[in-house]
């Protein structure tokens, strides 16, 4: 085969098929196919991210604490614990708080597994989020330089209507929940329970440095890995 023929064949192999989307003169790709391809690309990206997070033993909570997010976090905690018991798990969170019940499922799981859980506040850890942040392994609780923490007592979550007996039950439950939160934070931060109860009376905000002083976290993070 002559050099000219070889060059011609190599050139043809390198060229895309006529009509391939994205080539000059090709017909416009239908909008529906574009959307399907974009959705497929997104799914593939999420799979890659999930594999990366699994390989690095990282869990993320971004948003409110509810049954759905708690199920996701707890499932991953148990999966990583089963995979390599006793090896560190990194828990990144940015949350305004949410359901106390759902949050306590995460909290208890963190405390019951053998693997130490490092907590990293990426932006905001408020309400239930602050309790989860404080629950990390002592010495391994971190916050981003511009992260914020807010603690406060639990609320009834709106206007409560009903007979007085029901309202008394709600009030008693709030008091029990408040006391539980104060006890947990006192244990995790080293603050007195009286100080926590006092700070619970209003929204108590802390920047990164103040969160370290308070004992919610141990260090302001300066690099991820």
For the regions a language model picked out, list residue spans one by one.
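N-terminal organellar transit peptides
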Residues: 1-128, 135-225
């Amino acid at each position: 085969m002559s050099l000219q023929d070889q060059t011609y064949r190599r050139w043809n192999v390198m060229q895309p098929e006529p009509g391939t989307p994205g080539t000059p003169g090709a017909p416009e790709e239908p909008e529906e196919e574009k959307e399907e391809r974009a959705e497929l690309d997104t799914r593939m990206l999420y799979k890659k991210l999930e594999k990366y997070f699994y390989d690095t033993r990282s869990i993320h909570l971004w948003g409110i604490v509810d049954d759905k997010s708690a199920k996701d976090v707890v499932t991953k905690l148990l999966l990583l614990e089963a995979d390599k018991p006793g090896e560190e798990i990194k828990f990144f969170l940015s949350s305004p708080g949410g359901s106390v019940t759902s949050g306590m499922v995460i909290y208890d799981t963190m405390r019951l597994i053998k693997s130490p859980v490092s907590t990293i506040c990426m932006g905001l850890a408020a309400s239930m989020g602050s309790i989860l942040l404080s629950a990390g392994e002592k010495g391994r609780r971190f916050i981003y330089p511009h992260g914020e923490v807010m603690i406060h007592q639990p609320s009834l979550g709106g206007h409560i209507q009903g007979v007085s007996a029901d309202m008394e039950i709600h009030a008693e439950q709030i008091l029990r929940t408040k006391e539980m939160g104060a006890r947990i934070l006192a244990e995790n931060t080293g603050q007195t329970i009286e100080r926590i109860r006092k700070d619970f009376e209003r929204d108590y905000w802390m920047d990164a440095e103040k969160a370290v002083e308070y004992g919610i976290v141990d260090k302001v993070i300066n690099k991820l890995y």
